[in-house]
């Protein structure tokens, strides 16, 4: 079990039947002043979503990489406030933000953005109906996206097809 505790990321052994002090992992995981929102483990990496961007820590090399929004780079994160992180059945990392979803490309070490607006005021069909993404859930080849005001979006990873579900009062 990975937790945010005292400005860092620690591990608690689940086998212990009592509350215990978290195990210190690495000084690289000390993140003072960083508002951590979500932690996700993928193989030998820990992905940390925060209000200050995304951190990816490699447990073998003990190296930390910090990803942030860059207005001059369309392959950077779409926004720095990370609301959720999930892994698809194809082992692709998805990063939810207040401005859409970001698909991590391990080959290029950058992101593909999925959001409502192209940036030119044009609304794209078959995409998110709200950029403010609260949560992600992956179920095989399906990605469920919970949004702030757009309701639930159902994405198919293979075709990046999005279906929108929302309440009409």
Q: Can you say where each PLM-predicted feature lies in the sequence?
A:
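Carboxylate-rich, polar loop motifs that coordinate divalent cations or form catalytic acidic clusters
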Residues: 1-169
């Amino acid at each position: 079990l990975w937790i945010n505790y005292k400005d860092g990321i620690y591990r608690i052994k689940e086998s212990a039947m009592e509350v215990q002090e978290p195990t210190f992992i690495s000084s690289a995981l000390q993140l003072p002043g960083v508002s951590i929102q979500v932690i996700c483990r993928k193989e030998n990496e820990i992905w940390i979503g925060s209000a200050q961007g995304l951190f990816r820590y490699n447990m073998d090399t003990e190296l930390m990489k910090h990803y942030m929004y860059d207005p001059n780079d369309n392959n950077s994160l779409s926004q720095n406030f990370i609301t959720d992180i999930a892994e698809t059945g194809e082992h692709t990392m998805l990063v939810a933000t207040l401005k859409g979803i970001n698909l991590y490309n391990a080959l290029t070490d950058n992101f593909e953005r999925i959001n409502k607006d192209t940036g030119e005021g044009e609304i794209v069909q078959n995409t998110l109906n709200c950029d403010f993404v609260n949560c992600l859930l992956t179920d095989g080849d399906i990605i469920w996206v919970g949004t702030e005001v757009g309701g639930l979006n159902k994405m198919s990873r293979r075709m990046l097809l999005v279906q929108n579900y929302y309440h009409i009062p």
